[in-house]
């Protein structure tokens, strides 16, 4: 028996899909045969990344500007993607931000900035997608929420209690949505990366990166591409009985 994951004739929306983990997932979806709608907020290179993906993999791929924290805007853009590239069959809710400060320095603006994207933004995207599927009667929708191993741990010596808390919140949000939307045949799962070579980890000096990598059983940070396989599986029919789960792709960090 041959086991392959094929997303041909599918369409996937990837928020934050023009860089880091999101870009790797956009590329992986396209490589598996899916059309891809990349959501970006302010990056100038998003349209270039979409064009490159389209040419390399021979699929439709377009970039759409959208602040995921604006509920009405998300609904408008998702409807547009569904009309232009769709029907959309899956969502990777990847967009996220972090502010690294000591707890005594945080303020409400920091909280709002992080939770508006990492929690409310994820909800907006999942809600908009689920509404489209409900309205059109589509019953095989899959949502993959990119959380973090920080949903479970504090990641010392980094001081990012708001980020960690937002990931704990979004992981539980995903479980709640999975339970509520199961009757609609909409699956919701969380993929929680460990340390990955992205812009978010590039601020660390080499000494800190070495310290963090030494705490991982596999003794290294992951490449963004190493996150994509699990996401593709969760989007595919091969995972048709998987919902409400949180899957850690962390090099064994949580068992160390």
From Swiss-Prot:
Binding site for NADP(+): 21, 49, 67, 94, 163, 167, 196, 198, 200
A family per Pfam: adh_short_C2
Listed EC numbers: 1.1.1.138
Record bears the keyword Oxidoreductase: yes
Catalytic activity: D-mannitol + NADP(+) = D-fructose + NADPH + H(+)
A GO term, aspect molecular function: oxidoreductase activity, acting on NAD(P)H, oxygen as acceptor
Keywords: NADP, Oxidoreductase
CDD domains in the record: MDH-like_SDR_c
Transmembrane segments: none
Active site: 148, 163, 167
Claim: Oxidoreductase is one of the keywords in the record: yes
EC class of the enzyme, as a word: oxidoreductase
Purpose: May be involved in hexitol or pentitol metabolism.
Family from the record: Belongs to the short-chain dehydrogenases/reductases (SDR) family.
Record-given protein name: Probable NADP-dependent mannitol dehydrogenase
Gene responsible for this protein: PIG8
